[in-house]
Amino acid sequence: MTRLTRVLTFLSVVLTASSQASLEIVITEGIDSARPIAIVPFKWNGPGQMPESLSEVVSGDLLRSGKFSPIDSTDMPGQPHNDNELDYSAWAATGVEAILVGSVTPEGPDRYRVNFTLVDAIRGQITGGNARALSGGKLTNSNDHILDSRQTVITGQGFRQYAHRISDVVYEKLTGEKGAFMTRIAYVVVRDRKTNEFPYQLVVADYDGVNETMLLRSKEPLMSPSWSPDGTKLAYVTFENKRSQIYIQDLYTMSRTQMTDFPGINSAPVFSPNGRQLAMVLSKDGNPEIYVMDVASKRLERITRNRAIDTEPSWTPDGKSLIFSSERGGKPQIYRVDLASNNVRRVTFDGEMNLGGTITPDGGRMVMVNRTRGNYHIAAQDLENGNIQVLTKTYLDESPSIAPNGSMIIYSTLHQGKQVLSLVSLDGRFKARLPASDGQVKSPSWSPFLL
């Protein structure tokens, strides 16, 4: 059983969760530049209806990636279910680059065999799917138009999860980058205090808002969830005891461990890349400073020493430095401290303010909140040349979190007077909003790869 399967299975047993999405992605910009692709409805070889449509989930995943535009099934010249049934000349008019075909066959009580094949439509049009190549001195079918072909057996509850797996395969084969459709997001939901005894809720859900699960509810604020690098724990800040404290919660056992209870500020916990340390902000010595705590021993090391406020730490991918926000230059800007030498250098200079910096997994860019002419927007800075690109046009943006493949950013913003989550691609072309059905949503955190 995979790590993600174990976590999801445990949560479904011990917690009351909604299988429907209380967050639903609404795409607002970016489809025109996406690549056309065909996700043919999978053939159902059983009685009644398929437990869940794999093709619909895959189409939704690829559409929300901002890189693909699945064509409507009514625009398909047919609905083949394997590569042998494809009429490449008929498909040429659709302009698609790739075609996904597949089938689902019941194999016993709650067991279903899924077959799928990803076909290079352009190569198939050239060869007709009948390319030949020399192998061992003989001409054989090369199948060089087949990009991937797999089969597996799943349960009825595993349809949606396996559809995300198919999406990952398609995405990686066509972009060369790992897909992030099997990931999850954590966030805080705030409901009306007058009508809810526990208005603050810490929630995790699939990346697309489905399978929402409440981990914790509280009468007092919850904030700043942060995933461990193995995806099994969350660190967060709670005011349950009328003061800020940092906890780590295990997603297998749901057990909670209090990490800090210092006087003053205890905030902004974030796991190191190896999961052994936790960076945080503490004001126990009088001024908000950056600290690093060893998770096992709780031993603390103070990192910054400055009269200005230092906050919002994040780790560089190699774990050797921290990025943080500081007012030491007058207005909040982003700095970098080397943990071996304690040398600090300023990273951002453009704009009135820059806050909440996080470096992309490849180390090439930094995502942050940029304030220019009084507007707070999500921006990305090229760390080689220092150029900053403003990515969003939304209002009062905050708390950006990057997908583990570096392709997308989730953040909190104000829309029609409510805090909602939004998505923007790293190049700024694709934009979407995740409006909540109830309450305000903030402090998003994207999980690492869970498999």
From Swiss-Prot:
GO cellular component, one term: periplasmic space
BP-aspect Gene Ontology terms: cell division; protein import
SUPFAM superfamilies reported in the protein's UniProt record: TolB, N-terminal domain, Tricorn protease N-terminal domain
Record has Cell cycle as a keyword: yes
Keyword Isomerase part of the UniProt annotation: no
Signal peptide: 1-23
Gene3D superfamilies registered for this protein in UniProt: TolB, C-terminal domain, TolB, N-terminal domain
Cellular compartments annotated: Periplasm
Pfam family of the protein (one): PD40
Keywords, sorted A to Z: Cell cycle, Cell division, Periplasm, Signal
Task performed by this protein: Part of the Tol-Pal system, which plays a role in outer membrane invagination during cell division and is important for maintaining outer membrane integrity.
Oligomeric and partner information: The Tol-Pal system is composed of five core proteins: the inner membrane proteins TolA, TolQ and TolR, the periplasmic protein TolB and the outer membrane protein Pal. They form a network linking the inner and outer membranes and the peptidoglycan layer.
Family indicated by similarity: Belongs to the TolB family.
Protein name in the entry: Tol-Pal system protein TolB
Taxonomic path: Bacteria, Pseudomonadati, Pseudomonadota, Gammaproteobacteria, Alteromonadales
Name of the gene encoding the protein in the UniProt record: tolB
